[in-house]
UniProtKB/Swiss-Prot annotation:
Protein name, entry field: Spore wall and anchoring disk complex protein EnP1
Residue numbers covered by motif HBM3: 322-327
Keyword match Glycoprotein: yes
Locus of motif HBM1: 193-198
The organism of origin for this protein: Encephalitozoon intestinalis (Microsporidian parasite)
Amino acid sequence: MKLLGLLISAFGAINALKIKALYLSCDYELRPYNAVIDSQCMAFALNGSNIHEAIRYLNAMNIDKAYVLYWNDHDLHQNPMVLHKNGALAPFDRYTNTAKHVLCVEACSCPGPQSRPVVCPENNGASVSSPCPPCGQGNNTTVCDKVVVNPQPVKPLPAPCTPCAPCESSSSEKSESKECMTFPRICKKKCGPRHGRSPKKVEIVKSQKTYTFDIERYKRRGDVVVRVCSQDCKDKFEKFVLTKTGEIRKGKDKKCIPEPLPECLQCPKNLYKLKSGIEAKVCSEVCMYINSKCEIFVLIGDCDFYKVVMNERRRKQSSFHLKKIRGQKLRELIRQGLFGVEFSPLKC
């Protein structure tokens, strides 16, 4: 009985602490328990008496879902549960049900570098200690979300969140922009005699293209110098001028006929504005890609892939939203290969 009383007291002490969310980087997204240990946190013990406070916390911080490592007296660090902000509690599944946060009750430092879109949280009626987290902290620093859930009558709401400050400059204006990863399409070709006992040889061919638009020249004249780097077993470079009317002007070498540009790249002005708008929204540099279907994707940080979906019903050309790609869809997208799209001055 004494042991039971001590356990009840311990759980009561834990529940009395402030709920905090630990943001998980890519290395910890599937191992939330390791993130809690490495950050010297105490895992939050969820039960029937505090689940409503946890739900109010998620809504106050605008967090869709978070890992829970303890439910009542059950240790779930091997197979955690995922608590959604609508109140649903479901088992963890690495393909269909993951989270970017884990609930804890101790002051913790977020483990590892990470990059994520910074959004000012909306207050849904809970008392928030820091309504607007700082924006534009960079890719190597992060701030743990902190909120105080007050079960007492709610005080008047604080002033609306001010918009995130714009990023210092876009990636195309920096002298040293980060190098984007490449995602070549890998094909296997069989060669050798079709008949006979000799084995067939398999040749692996990597196909990759990167389109670079000289936006500096575009600002001066309206024309854009385009450089296409193709990597099919060996590097091949093409360079031509794309006029503001969409016409391709060939160089001095008349024998060189540039390949036609994909339709989504024929108006680099709008594409450049789209990328700048995305970078201003997430307060971070992004890498832009297209696939063979001319669909546009961006990579934020080192592991967050998003599909850019344009809102055609709205009149503004810059109206878009980002749809995260993960799991089997992401693996299939990378397997089929992606073409890089960059905006920077051409040195040659």
